A protein has these predicted regions:
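Glycine-rich flexible loops
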Residues: 1-423
Length: 423
């Protein structure tokens, strides 16, 4: 994973802005910390607008316990200090109160980490810490106890969540993955379904690696810029997280795709990976979706762009087995047409089944407990379909939450739409 070339104070201000902009914290809530190589802990301040933090606002605590800076440190700094001093392998803490994870903390129940691959591996061992007064030594001791026992993620009763990692970049990716997993679980509950847990054997399927020869140079700058714009847009619209989501775009002799294990929002055009057959750009590792992307492009000349996502509402359908019905509104059907569903593990064990069935007329493939694959005639078309898919899934979840009855467009009305719009 590429780390940002920033000083600790700059990094804390940057990620706090991202937290706030993504509605994962409030003006007064949440705090971030970094322990540097000299044993100095940098931490966000107390009582300063989280939407407009600057590096000059960040506080620091030296090894002798002296606090420096123009504000007061976060009231939670005792537990940051306790955790980072007790775990030398951790160099960053993230604490926040996103709505979905607070819901779990109020129920005093852990979000399911094993309904999608990669979440548990990224977030590490998770536990719940007993409630204690915010900012108290008691709370710090309760949290530090869980981290000392090997946890990297701790849910706080009636409070929020704390994550520790080797870098703030990694902690942020863990946090967004956990939040999306929590929101996916809530969406499944709204559908009155239980999310299917994956077994260790099923999760192990994801250990399959594909080797690519390092032999290509990168080009297609215009395509790369457009892909980055779409990645940012998808992230800002909560379709991607820093840890999940990718686009693939056809080129003359292959395709370009996101790199593996990089923050989606921080990915730059030069980091995207060009793939041709079994070759890719030197020194780069393409997304885990490169294999299926190549197969789809090879089989379907009309498909120019592909999106891969784990957006929470549609993933509620993917992890629960609930049926997604695209016959909701005319605009939705025109955009989405028909969807296909494949069992978990198909990406690794039988990718040709996905490549054979996806098409412009059936552009959506829901891979159970894994992801959705969206095919389009352009990057914008793929993005539009992905966005409409998530909006539609949210509407269906809302109907279930209201204990309502879905009245879809009839088959006769669907035929009328198909004739009118030449579908």
């Amino acid at each position: 994973m590429k780390l940002l070339n920033m000083k600790p104070a700059e990094k804390i201000a940057y990620f706090m802005t991202r937290l706030y902009d993504n509605k994962l914290t409030t003006t007064s809530g949440g705090n971030l910390s970094i322990m540097d190589e000299d044993g100095v802990m940098w931490i966000s301040p107390s009582g300063v607008d989280k939407a407009h933090l600057t590096p000059e606002d960040i506080m620091w605590v030296t090894p002798d316990g002296v606090v420096h800076g123009k504000h007061k440190p976060s009231t939670e700094y005792p537990f940051h200090l306790a955790v980072l001093r007790s775990r030398p392998d951790l160099h960053a803490d993230l604490h926040a109160h996103p709505a979905a994870l607070v819901a779990y903390s109020l129920e005093r129940k852990l979000p399911k980490m094993d309904v999608m691959p990669g979440v548990s591996a990224l977030c590490g061992k998770i536990a719940i810490a007993k409630y204690a007064l915010p900012g108290s030594q008691k709370l710090g001791a309760l949290i530090a106890e869980k981290f000392a026992a090997g946890c990297d993620t701790v849910l706080l009763e009636n409070h929020g969540v704390v994550l520790g990692a080797e870098s703030l970049e990694r902690a942020f990716m863990m946090f967004e993955a956990l939040d999306f997993a929590g929101r996916t679980g809530i969406a499944a509950s709204m559908l009155k379904k239980d999310a299917k847990k994956l077994t260790e054997t099923e999760l192990a399927v994801k250990n399959v690696k594909y080797d690519y020869k390092d032999s290509l140079a990168h080009d297609e700058l215009e395509i790369r810029d457009e892909m980055i714009n779409m990645c940012h847009r998808s992230y800002e619209h909560k379709l991607f997280t820093s840890a999940s989501g990718a686009f693939a775009q056809r080129t003359e002799n292959g395709f370009i795709i996101n790199p593996d294990d990089e923050d989606v929002f921080c990915t730059t055009a030069d980091m995207l990976v060009r793939v041709e057959g079994d070759k890719c750009e030197s020194g780069k590792v393409p997304s885990k979706y490169a294999k299926i992307a190549g197969m789809i492009f090879e089989k379907h000349e009309e498909i120019e762009s592909i999106a891969f996502a784990r957006s929470p509402y549609i993933m509620g359908f993917a992890v629960s087995g609930a049926e997604f019905n695209s016959h909701m509104i005319p605009e939705g059907y025109i955009c989405l047409r028909n969807t296909m569903r494949h069992p978990y593990g198909t990406l690794e064990t039988a990718p040709e089944k996905i490549a054979d069935t996806i098409s412009i007329k059936t552009p959506i493939a829901i891979i159970e407990n894994d992801c959705v694959i969206v095919a389009g005639t352009s990057l914008l078309n793929a993005f539009d379909r992905m966005e409409v898919l998530e909006f539609g899934a949210e509407s269906l979840c809302d109907i279930e939450a209201m204990n309502g009855t879905i009245v879809p467009i009839s088959n006769e009305e669907i035929r009328e739409i198909e004739e009118a719009f030449n579908l």
